[in-house]
Amino acid sequence: MKPTEYLKSVGIDIFLEGHNSYKLASTGYMDLTVETWQGGDDITFVSMCHYGEQNGDLMADSDILFKVEQEIITYREIQMAYTAYYSEDHAEIKDFMENTWVDNLIQQGHKVYEKDIEA
């Protein structure tokens, strides 16, 4: 599942105007913090991370920032099949997000417990 689909499934609208933050929890697991903000030109930035405490300081453990562009970036038809292109530099991160981290969050059952919406 794509991170944007997961966020929508737990009630987070990444396209809300402003800089918004959400905290999600699941008993026995680290809380998840999600922040969203707009960068202009139909671009939305999303940060997803877990925070842990180390020597009294908050440390991000798995902190991923990605941007969502609300337009078609690349489209190519090959024998009637859709092919998406991702930078080689980001392919490993994309695979981790879609096939590991999001699946783990779903299985762990994180739910939104706090919202800070900039109106």
Predicted regions located by residue number:
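Negatively charged, low-complexity tracts enriched in Asp/Glu with abundant Ser/Thr
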Residues: 1-53
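Amphipathic protein-protein interaction modules
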Residues: 51-89
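Helix-rich interaction surfaces within compact, conserved domain-sized segments
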Residues: 74-119
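Generic structural motif recognizing short loop/turn segments at the entrances and edges of beta-strands
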Residues: 18-20, 28-32, 42-44, 62-64, ...
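Acidic-enriched, low-complexity/disordered segments with a strong bias for Aspartate over Glutamate
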Residues: 13, 31, 41-42, 57, ...
